[in-house]
Amino acid sequence: KDGYLMEPNGCKLGCLTRPAKYCWXEE
């Protein structure tokens, strides 16, 4: 699956190498 960046508005497609929290989902 693709990594999605966790943001206040939901999950945005993000890079897994970035220092941030992630969730797995589809939007």
Swiss-Prot record:
Main location: secreted
SUPFAM superfamilies: Scorpion toxin-like
GO cellular component: extracellular region
LCN-type CS-alpha/beta domain: residues covered: 1-27
Alphabetical UniProt keywords: Ion channel impairing toxin, Neurotoxin, Secreted, Toxin, Voltage-gated sodium channel impairing toxin
Subcellular location: Secreted
UniProt cross-references to Gene3D superfamilies, sorted A to Z: Knottin, scorpion toxin-like
GO molecular function term, any single one: toxin activity
Domain notes: Has the structural arrangement of an alpha-helix connected to antiparallel beta-sheets by disulfide bonds (CS-alpha/beta).
Function: Beta toxins bind voltage-independently at site-4 of sodium channels (Nav) and shift the voltage of activation toward more negative potentials thereby affecting sodium channel activation and promoting spontaneous and repetitive firing. This toxin is active against mammals and also affects neuromuscular preparations of frog.
UniProt record similarity statement: Belongs to the long (4 C-C) scorpion toxin superfamily. Sodium channel inhibitor family. Beta subfamily.
UniProt-recorded name of the protein: Toxin TdII-4
